[in-house]
């Protein structure tokens, strides 16, 4: 049919210590048939956010987010929070799940041996894939030979094993929380939270 479905119940958010983000600058850097790209500078009380994004007509969206610490601090968490609309979170594939009905509550932690960095959650003709990476990303081998070139663990997302992904049913949809956990930062430290979406 021609009637679309809303995948998200609310806008996705990269939430971090320091409160709400305030936009300082926004610029369209590419606008052509099939693709648009932009960059933005945001800040909160704890971090400066340098963001580059690109969206293509096939539903692929790439975000490269660099957080720069504005002060020495103990950080509770930086997390990509996604809330799917009711009825969208029916099936799941990735993070060790082979594909099928999703298990209602799911928790996953980074582990280089598992060679996993992406999840898809959705319904028939509607869903979202989220892949997490960083500024040193190298495409892993996804065949029987992947042990010869293991996954490059994204340092900011993994955070020494503190990071992971929780997926839960809520009263009005499904929540996906890709978290990185507690860490200490020094003023000027850079954290690279890159992610790719396929809708």
List PLM regions with ranges.
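Beta-strand-rich recognition/accessory modules
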Residues: 2-25, 30-31, 42-43, 74, ...
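Short, hydrophobic/aromatic-enriched beta-strand segments in well-ordered soluble domains
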Residues: 38-42, 51-53, 67-69, 80-82, ...
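Short, hydrophobic/aromatic-rich segments at coil-to-beta transitions
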Residues: 31-39, 60-63
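Glycine-rich (often Gly-Gly/Gly-Pro-rich) flexible segments and glycine-rich loop motifs
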Residues: 110-115
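Short, solvent-exposed beta-strand/turn "edge" segments of beta-rich domains on protein surfaces
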Residues: 51-58, 91, 184-187
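Acidic (Asp/Glu-rich), glycine- and aromatic
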Residues: 56, 60-109
